[in-house]
């Protein structure tokens, strides 16, 4: 189907959370309505409570409300907080960066510490070149992803705010 609409290489993932070795329905993610609400994946929180406390028009932001979500495996909660921590770490510790945006994309069925994409956008101070900072930024992103469980620990211990 994709070849009808693009000449680009397309990779399709279907039912990646299913367990093909299962001998009964417990290994498959099946719903009657087609929504996650029947499987306990729903959040009981509105969309106004941003992880960083801000509603930022004309800037990248997530509509995900982090409060009330599972701090162990809800990527909307974890990646929102993780993105903020990465951005703070980079801006505080890498000379020459004024601002930073971090975007992390999950993939169903993959471990949380292995996102489909982790993308950064930096706004540099005058005279600073991307090649002066890119390796340092990449190292900080990698370090946070390797130790992503600290996000859960900090939320559970009340050290990290979710709004």
Q: What does each of the following model-derived ranges do?
A:
Residues 1-163:
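A domain-level signal for the structural core that forms small-molecule/cofactor-binding pockets
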């Amino acid at each position: 189907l994709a070849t009808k609409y693009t000449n680009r290489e397309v990779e399709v993932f279907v039912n990646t959370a299913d367990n093909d070795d299962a001998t009964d329905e417990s290994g498959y993610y099946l719903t009657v309505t087609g929504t996650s609400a029947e499987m306990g994946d729903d959040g009981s929180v509105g969309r106004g409570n941003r992880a960083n406390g801000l509603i930022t028009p004309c800037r990248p932001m997530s509509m995900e409300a982090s409060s009330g979500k599972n701090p162990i495996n809800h990527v909307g909660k974890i990646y929102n907080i993780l993105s903020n921590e990465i951005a703070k770490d980079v801006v505080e510790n890498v000379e020459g960066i004024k601002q930073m945006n971090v975007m992390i994309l999950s993939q169903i069925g993959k471990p949380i510490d292995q996102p489909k994409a982790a993308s950064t956008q930096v706004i540099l101070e005058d005279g600073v070149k991307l090649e002066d900072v890119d390796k340092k930024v990449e190292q900080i992103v990698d370090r946070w992803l390797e130790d992503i469980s600290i996000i859960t620990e900090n939320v559970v211990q009340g050290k990290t705010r979710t709004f």
